[in-house]
């Protein structure tokens, strides 16, 4: 396939045009008075959104050279979104400001490599300053604030705060469609997995068709149980305690199942058998999770634990177990809290290491079940377009809130980035030459988001910045929604520190790459051959 090439200044200018086209479409959405963008879809109704990453992802430019620049900005937005769940528009505005200023200097003869070095040093200092300005979330009210700002809705903020309140910081919160017009939170307490009773004869509540076991002993094994002989010793021990028994195994059939059912029907031993959740390696991990949660052991050949040798101490315990046709919920597991914490930390480490999205989701789900429950936010709306938009806002707000819990909050409205210039200012005294110019590029760009927020709300950005910098209070800023100045923390205008940090780091990374680009290579578009027309006599 033949290629087209562009070199030096011509290449960089083409990239800049692509960057500007995407950034100009995205930056009008920044701040409380940002506008919406309507995106045509090849199927279904158009999408109305003010989410930076959604807009950027939809843009594909006709000019292949410009499109390379557009793709780089998309990368800034999606990388920030993946890491922090928000701040995509801020990242785009920062990237555009750094690229514009940087290209001016490269055209004037500055060394791109030294510029990049200066940019990296300045960003490092600014990030340190952001960390200093951050403070930990103090409770439910702060969580509601962060979520409300991200979603642009106090109601959504309250829903997310309620969900987090119930499942804790590590709990899983999922977003699903509601069957009604209402948006509400549904909560599943304890550990739940998608496996029900093997036989309906185990049912204790005929009306609800479910098994309820109070304070049961829990036998956990990764084997298939068919013969009854290995089970007899432990069944006798459990029967003597008068407590019910839950058996979780790869499968229970034949003699083993018959014995459990008969004992239940005779009233000798109330019990229930369910299949183990998951498959393969995931099944082993989930059985181990259940064992740690309930304080039991997995009877497994791999671990050298035989069914015949099991004692009552090897069985798990819980306050209550509910088993339906296709789900089991274990409430109030009696496992050692320290062991549970260690297991959660282990799963957290695995989440950070994995690159697979599916793997990440299953690990997060496992972690939530250990942490104490799953909350589902059911989203309702009158139309499909509204539902899509609302669901998207809730998912974004959820990610931003998690980021805030992780690294704390900073004053919002672009104030933190503006205040972090102080650290870059000190750095400028230490640098010289093109490195100093690189740091100045970052210094200038740090005021771009607040200027854009002010302009979107109809104010003069330069005047707003001057007034903010006249105050010594690091949290003093401008409320663009009401047109007032004041302490951003007191006004509830806050951002997750992780969002602000990620936006700056990702913008600088792409800007540095673009400034050091000398050649663009794209595929030459194929010329469409005209279809020959048929002779007239046909």
Swiss-Prot record:
Main localization, broad class: cytoplasm
Ligand binding (ATP): 29-32, 86-90, 413, 479-481, 495
Protein keywords: ATP-binding, Chaperone, Cytoplasm, Isomerase, Nucleotide-binding
Cross-referenced SUPFAM superfamilies: GroEL apical domain-like, GroEL equatorial domain-like, GroEL-intermediate domain like
Record-listed E.C. numbers: 5.6.1.7
Compartments where located: Cytoplasm
Keyword Chloroplast on entry: no
Domain of life assignment: Bacteria
Gene3D superfamilies: GroEL, GroEL-like equatorial domain, TCP-1-like chaperonin intermediate domain
UniProt xrefs under PANTHER family: 60 KDA HEAT SHOCK PROTEIN, MITOCHONDRIAL
UniProt record similarity statement: Belongs to the chaperonin (HSP60) family.
Record's subunit section: Forms a cylinder of 14 subunits composed of two heptameric rings stacked back-to-back. Interacts with the co-chaperonin GroES.
Protein's name in the database: Chaperonin GroEL
């Amino acid at each position: 396939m033949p290629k087209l090439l562009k070199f030096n200044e011509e290449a960089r200018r083409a990239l800049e045009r692509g960057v500007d086209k995407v950034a100009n479409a995205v930056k009008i959405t920044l701040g409380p008075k940002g506008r919406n963008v309507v995106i045509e879809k090849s199927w279904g109704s158009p999408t109305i959104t003010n989410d930076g990453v959604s807009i950027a992802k939809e843009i594909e430019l006709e000019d292949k050279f410009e499109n390379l620049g557009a793709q780089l900005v998309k990368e800034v937005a999606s990388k920030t979104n993946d890491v922090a769940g928000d701040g995509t528009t801020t990242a785009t505005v920062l990237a555009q400001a750094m690229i514009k200023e940087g290209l001016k200097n490269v055209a004037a003869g500055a060394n791109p490599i030294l510029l990049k070095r200066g940019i990296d040093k300045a960003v490092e200092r600014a990030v340190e300053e952001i960390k200093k300005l951050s403070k930990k979330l103090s409770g439910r009210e702060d969580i509601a604030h962060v979520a409300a700002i991200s979603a642009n809705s106090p109601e959504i903020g309250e829903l997310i705060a309620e969900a987090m309140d119930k499942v804790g910081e590590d709990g899983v919160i999922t977003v699903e469609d509601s069957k009604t017009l209402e948006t509400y939170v549904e909560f599943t307490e304890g550990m739940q997995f998608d496996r029900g009773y093997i036989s309906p004869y185990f049912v204790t509540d005929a009306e609800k068709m479910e098994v309820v076991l109070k304070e049961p002993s829990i036998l956990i094994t990764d084997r298939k149980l068919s013969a009854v002989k290995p089970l007899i010793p432990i069944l006798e021990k459990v029967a003597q305690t008068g407590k019910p028994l839950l058996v979780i195994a790869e499968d229970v059939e034949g003699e083993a199942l018959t014995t459990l059912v008969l004992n239940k029907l005779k009233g000798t031993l109330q019990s229930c058998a369910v299949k183990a959740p998951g498959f393969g390696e995931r099944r082993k991990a989930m059985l181990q999770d259940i064992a740690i949660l309930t304080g039991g052991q997995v009877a497994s050949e791999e671990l050298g634990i035989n069914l015949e040798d099991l004692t009552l101490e090897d069985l798990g315990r819980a306050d209550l177990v509910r088993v339906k046709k296709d789900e089991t919920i274990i409430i109030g597991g009696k496992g050692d809290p320290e062991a549970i914490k260690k297991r959660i930390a282990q799963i957290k480490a695995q989440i950070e290491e994995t690159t697979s999205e599916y793997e990440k989701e299953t690990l997060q789900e496992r972690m939530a079940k250990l942490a104490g429950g799953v909350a589902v936010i059911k989203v309702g709306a009158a139309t499909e377009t509204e539902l899509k938009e609302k669901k998207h806002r809730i998912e974004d707000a959820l990610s931003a809130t998690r980021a805030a819990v992780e690294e704390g909050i900073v004053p919002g409205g672009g104030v933190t980035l503006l205040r972090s210039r102080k650290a870059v200012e000190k750095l400028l005294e230490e640098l010289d030459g093109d490195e100093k110019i690189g740091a100045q590029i970052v210094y200038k760009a740090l005021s771009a988001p607040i200027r854009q927020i002010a302009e979107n709300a109809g104010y003069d950005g330069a005047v707003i910045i001057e007034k903010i910098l006249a105050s010594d209070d690091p949290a003093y800023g401008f409320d663009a929604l009401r047109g007032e100045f004041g302490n951003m923390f007191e006004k509830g205008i806050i951002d997750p520190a992780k969002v602000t940090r990620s936006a700056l780091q990702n913008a600088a990374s792409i800007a540095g790459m673009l400034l050091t680009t000398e050649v663009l290579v794209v595929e030459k578009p194929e010329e469409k051959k005209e279809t020959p027309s048929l002779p007239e006599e046909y």
